[in-house]
UniProtKB/Swiss-Prot annotation:
SUPFAM superfamilies: FAD-linked oxidoreductase (SSF51730). Its EC number is 1.5.5.2. Homodimer. Keywords: FAD, Flavoprotein, Nucleotide-binding, Oxidoreductase, Proline metabolism. The active site is at 133, 184. This is Proline dehydrogenase.
């Protein structure tokens, strides 16, 4: 295992301890504000409006993972519906992202499908695009099944995510081609065993570019979710060399990460979106951000010292 993946594994392991969670929640509020738009829908909409003024579109994401009861799943669905209704009147592109575990995937695929179907029935006529996030490897197959089911039911304003660090992803991409998916490509942020995921960052990066170029060659619309300057530069070079119009792809960033680069790409004429998370259940999201970059851990330590 290389140092990058060893660091990520260490951080995700430590962050799972209840004492660490309590400490960060109590003393690292400055870091939370950097990466999370707020705990309320109103705060998230204000953050989205600020991004729009800079030429960057927003992806709204109500945080929350792995509900334990059907009642919790339905409560989370109500939060999603409130988000859809709030976006309906906005003049800018409307886009939300969600995880199927938030809608009860671990309880029942039928429950998650039914709740998501109701969200899409409200979202599509209001011009709200819905992205299904991909979670850890045990949930990939179920997520893909539900995506295919929704497309076969006629829903078109729904997209999927694939992760370049999983060995299976190229086959998943090829299997999805008949559905002409709107694809978000990510490297992957979950702690995965070497049996299912590439153990080396260089291999993950190479696979990311391979999958991205393959998707473009197949005519898919691709959202490249990456902060890696080398990958962004190569994708810009490749699309220009191949004559692929900028209307066929976009770049996506996390809220608070490389904001200057977001604005620069937007000024260059690329479509740029920032993933804007909000809600009270922000801790799992924040720990994955800390695990992605060692400098984020330094910010946590400073926050813990300064309070």
């Amino acid at each position: 295992m290389n140092l990058d993946l060893a660091y990520r594994s260490f951080v995700l392991g430590v962050a799972g301890h209840p004492q660490v969670e309590r400490l960060i929640k109590h003393r690292a509020k400055g870091l939370v504000r950097r990466y999370v738009a707020g705990e309320t829908l109103e705060e998230a909409l204000k953050a989205a409006e600020a991004l729009e003024r800079e030429g960057v579109h927003a992806i709204l994401d109500l945080l929350g993972e792995m509900v334990r009861t059907e009642e919790e799943a339905r409560a989370f669905q109500r939060g999603l519906l409130e988000l859809v209704w709030a976006l309906a009147g906005k003049p800018w592109p409307k886009y939300i992202s969600l995880k199927l575990t938030q809608l009860g995937l671990d309880l029942s695929e039928d429950l998650a499908l039914a709740l998501l179907r109701e969200v899409l029935r409200e979202a599509e006529p209001r011009g709200v695009f819905v992205r299904l996030d991909m979670e850890d490897s045990p949930r990939v197959e179920a997520t893909l099944r539900l995506y295919r089911a929704l497309r076969e039911e006629g829903f078109s304003q729904v997209g999927i995510v694939l992760q370049s660090y999983l060995y299976r992803t190229e086959k998943d991409l090829l299997d999805l081609l008949p559905y002409r998916p709107n694809l978000r490509l990510v490297k992957g942020a979950y702690r995965e065993p070497k049996e299912v995921a590439f153990p080396d960052k260089r291999l993950i990066d190479a696979e990311y570019l391979h999958l991205g170029k393959l998707a473009l060659k197949e005519g898919l619309y691709v959202a490249f979710a990456t902060h890696d300057p080398r990958i962004i530069a190569e994708l810009k070079r490749y699309t220009e060399a191949m004559g692929i119009p900028r209307s066929r792809f976009e770049f996506q960033f996390l809220y608070g990460v490389r904001p200057e680069e977001q604005r620069r790409l937007a000024r260059e004429g690329y479509t740029v979106r920032a993933y804007v998370p909000y809600g009270r259940d922000w801790y799992p999201y924040l720990t994955r951000r800390i695990a992605e970059r060692p400098e984020n851990l330094l910010l946590v330590l400073r926050s813990l010292v300064s309070g």
